[in-house]
């Protein structure tokens, strides 16, 4: 047994600048390729809220109030931030909903982004009032500028209508036995759409309105959509909507906010479509089951989810894939849940797992999403809610908030390093097969991505409180095997067929192996 001699920095001496790394360089004439990119796990997705992405908080109180000299986020002032995303290795921008939002029974002073109030109007709150263009023209300019940088653009479409819409278009909504529209789960600001009419047939008005929304988004040039709570609408509904979209753009992507293990938030009002049926309807992908990752304690919790997603992908001839969901706007900040160690682990899982990485605005610098105005009474409001409603530690989708940014500037360098490695090792991390390794400690997971004689090995400790020791069993590993550290704390001890590691709480280690056979 001996301690391997490592050549530190070997991998990164071979890396190149991040210029045009995540996105293709500017193209003459845009050609959407997002479905192909996503199926091959080659998209790197960055989610942002136009309301906040270009906002300027001049007095540092976290809330954006123009009367106090602040600037609200708009499509136009979001454009300058796009170039920075390409430097981070991003190639796909995911916009949280940009449609008009309701003002009645609202949550927050701007209203939830998901309280849909119009199928064919963008939110006037995202318009630059100092510019003569319409908000639709400004949105198209944003998309065009993204495309010039090689960035694809997808838009989130809500699953339910606002209370305002339920008053204006009652025939679109389910009614209970008392004739009242239905609140799904505890989403008190929205009402549940009626998918089937009284004869058990698809509600044509709803289908046509969703098609109208797709047309509006295609008219401004976007490359696809993410469907919120997609499973509360059935196969036949989505089949019609997706077929409609693909007549104009065969590469127009549909990503379902759905997961094989999730349950119906409105089960008494309808069935919940399965992920395979959504994929059969034409969806290109869904959410991996990572929302509760910080609650995982056993290696099997990680491995079984990877295998489940790979099984579904295989059933669809590898033409469908998943989007990472470790840190979306629905979860508390990674920093709140587990600090920098959890942030590092989730970053490297995004980089090395067979899925499409996803990062929320503010993630790169470790935003806690804790706002100074949290649930305080507001002096002014654009809705009937006069409180700054937010979920503690979660990305604000209810108010005019500051641009997300954390207090961990040093994390940006770590993020860029991880993304550089992802692109440098893409032949392994994109094209390589997934290999599970057994470990001697149930809280330690280990796997490899292998292509030919090269492999990337990832080892992580799910114990959030204690340092642990573990053996990782790697068939045919030799004392003389060439191992280069990508991310490492204490060097492992290597003997035939085994790596012995010591891992701090939530520590992840990453190695590049050459000339391996396992």
Pin down the residues of each PLM region.
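C-terminal beta-strand-rich structural cap/linker in extracellular carbohydrate-active enzymes
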Residues: 494-518
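The substrate-binding groove and active-site-proximal loops of carbohydrate-active enzymes
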Residues: 51-75, 115-136, 190-207, 222-232, ...
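Active-site-proximal helices and loops of the catalytic beta/alpha 8
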Residues: 28, 143, 212-215, 228-322, ...
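N-terminal structural segment of carbohydrate-active enzymes
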Residues: 26-152, 160, 506, 514
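Bacterial N-terminal signal peptides
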Residues: 10-21
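Active-site-adjacent "subsite" loops/lids of carbohydrate-active enzymes
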Residues: 163-222, 230-231
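Aromatic- and acidic-residue-enriched segments that line the glycan-binding/catalytic groove
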Residues: 101-120, 159-187, 267-282, 372-386
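Asparagine-centered strand-capping/turn motif at beta-strand->loop junctions
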Residues: 459-464
